[in-house]
From Swiss-Prot:
Extracellular-side segments: 209-239, 292-309, 368-379, 400-406
One Pfam family from the record: Ion_trans
Primary location: membrane
Lineage, uppermost ranks: Eukaryota, Metazoa, Chordata, Craniata, Vertebrata
Record motif Selectivity filter, residues: 392-397
Transmembrane feature ranges: 187-208, 240-262, 274-291, 310-330, 346-367, 407-435
Disulfide bond keyword on record: no
Intramembrane intervals: 380-391, 392-399
Source organism per UniProt: Mus musculus (Mouse)
Record-given protein name: Delayed-rectifier potassium channel regulatory subunit KCNS1
Record comment regarding domains: The transmembrane segment S4 functions as a voltage-sensor and is characterized by a series of positively charged amino acids at every third position. Channel opening and closing is effected by a conformation change that affects the position and orientation of the voltage-sensor paddle formed by S3 and S4 within the membrane. A transmembrane electric field that is positive inside would push the positively charged S4 segment outwards, thereby opening the pore, while a field that is negative inside would pull the S4 segment inwards and close the pore.
Gene name of the record: Kcns1
Biological processes, Gene Ontology terms: potassium ion transport; protein homooligomerization; regulation of potassium ion transmembrane transport
Region (Disordered): 464-497
Bilayer topology: Multi-pass membrane protein
């Protein structure tokens, strides 16, 4: 805190104490009265007005023009206009043109505390300041923007910059973009169509395999046949489906190995959910081969051990259903759904909690009213009825017969409608946000041509340094420009407050 009055024995003050203060904030010039500033001596301008020397005053501003007696501040001019209103009324209002964090930084710089905020703006400011900074407010029903997140684009550019020092980096980068971005080029679109076709063919083959006329023998029977030394032809699958399965596995293995070899970062490759889905889609096939080899080596094993290995083989085959998740790489909706579930764990938890409470309450009521009827003999048995009723599925396998049971069922159904509808609305809004955001990002990539996109990626190494130097030069030259061209010397053009 700078002393408000000069010390004893000092010479003539460097400026009259009651002289108006001439300030220039980001090109906005104002003349402030000493009496208005004296009302708030703890603020930066109040301390500047009471400065005992020019040296103390220079510590409080960015620059000082001794000839014009003008103090320069390289700060936001819009906030300065709100600051003038504060010196007139004693209340500070939040500006919509500034985010809450930038507003807080400006307020701290000028020496204003939270008590200076007007009552109409204080609650909104504190609520937004406590919230964690996110790309968008997760607690808000209306997303603020659907523009692509700059952080996501920066992460992609940072990863692609690794190709600059790699061997055959330009070729690897082009192949990587072809495999990862369906809208990057015509070959990438063809590759995406082939990949989708292989995934659909694999799923269709798995479904056809379950039909009786195409279904292979049960795994346990096949193991027993091999153990008995009978022909292996008796236990093989349909040859057409088997060849189709081999082709799909070969394609999936090619995709995984190619992405692994072309990936800019191996560590980030194994952390990406879509890459893990690709690995899981081919892993059951190779595990089945290992299990088959183990079965071949255990011809003398007991029937129980062979039956257990046969069940393991069945589990591995069942894991092929995860191949349908590979479509998420080529579907904007599936990727948006995954992002929605990732950012909606609170709402999903609340939904499950509401359902659990409702099922427990209404199951107890139904057990009391329908204890003698079949299906309601225990409270855990009533949980199935409560879950089906609250989710409004209504299989009808268990039906209450008494008046009390029917009333409980009515309350359970109505409560389920309300309980499920509330969190679902929030989840749907988030899905809409992520979907529009993903579509906007894809549109931004498609709008730029392939050559422009390549030039952008090839220059990503020098973008940061050039931007940094440019911003420094601009910040250093901007203030002199304001002082020389935008700051007239005539006091008559300054506004007095």
């Amino acid at each position: 805190m700078v002393s408000e009055f000069p010390g004893p024995g000092s010479r003539v003050p460097w400026r009259p104490r009651d002289e108006a203060l001439r300030v220039n904030v980001g090109g906005v010039r104002r003349l402030l009265s000493a009496r208005a500033l004296a009302r708030f001596p703890g603020t930066r301008l109040g301390r500047l007005q009471a400065a005992a020397s020019e040296e103390q005053a220079r510590r409080l501003c960015d620059d000082y023009d001794a000839a014009a007696h003008e103090f320069y501040f390289d700060r936001h001019p819009g906030f300065f206009l709100g600051l003038l209103h504060f010196y007139r009324t004693g209340h500070l209002h939040v500006l919509d043109e500034l985010c809450v964090f930038a507003f807080g930084q400006e307020a701290d710089y000028w020496g204003l505390g939270e008590n200076a905020l007007a009552t109409c703006c204080r609650a909104r400011y504190l609520e937004r300041r406590v919230a964690r900074p996110r790309a968008w407010d997760e607690d808000s029903d209306a997303p603020s923007s659907v523009d692509p997140c700059p952080d996501e684009i920066s992460d992609v550019q940072r990863e692609l910059a690794r190709y600059g020092a790699a061997r055959c980096g330009r070729l690897r980068r082009r192949l990587w973009l072809t495999m990862e971005n369906p809208g990057y080029s015509l070959p990438s679109k063809l590759f995406s169509c082939v990949s989708i076709g292989v995934v659909l063919a694999s799923i269709a083959a798995m479904c056809i395999h379950s039909l009786p006329e195409y279904q292979a023998r049960e795994a346990a029977a096949a193991v027993a046949a091999v153990a008995a030394g009978r022909s292996a032809e008796e236990v093989r699958d349909d040859p057409v489906l088997r060849r189709l399965e081999y082709f799909c596995i070969a394609w999936f293995s090619f995709e995984v190995s190619s992405r692994l070899l072309l990936a800019p970062s191996t560590r980030n490759f194994f952390c990406h959910p879509l890459n893990l889905i690709d690995i899981v889609s081919v892993l059951p096939f190779y595990l089945t081969l290992l299990a088959g080899a183990a079965l071949g080596d255990q011809r003398g094993a007991s029937g129980e051990e062979l039956g257990d290995l046969g069940k393991v083989v069945q589990v591995f085959r069942l894991m092929r259903i995860f191949r349908v998740l590979k479509l998420a790489r080529h579907s904007t909706g599936l990727r948006s759904l995954g992002a929605t579930l990732k950012h909606s764990y609170r709402e999903v938890g609340i939904l499950l909690l509401y359902l659990a409470v409702g099922v427990s309450v209404f199951s107890g009521v139904a057990y009391t009213a329908e204890e003698e009827n079949e299906g309601f003999h225990t409270i855990p048995a009533c949980w199935w009825w409560g879950t089906v009723s609250m989710t409004t599925v209504g299989y009808g396998d268990v039906v209450p017969e008494t008046v009390g049971g029917k009333l409980a069922a009515s309350g359970c159904i109505l409560g389920g409608i309300l309980v499920v509808a509330l969190p679902i609305t929030i989840i749907f809004n988030k899905f809409s946000h992520f979907y529009r955001r993903q579509k906007a990002l894809e549109a931004a990539v498609r709008s730029s041509g392939q050559r422009e996109f390549e030039d952008l990626l090839s220059s990503v190494d020098g973008v940061s340094d050039v931007s940094l130097e440019t911003s420094r030069d601009t910040s250093q030259e901007g203030r002199s420009t304001d002082l020389e061209t935008q700051a007239p010397r005539e006091p008559a053009k300054s506004h007095s407050y």
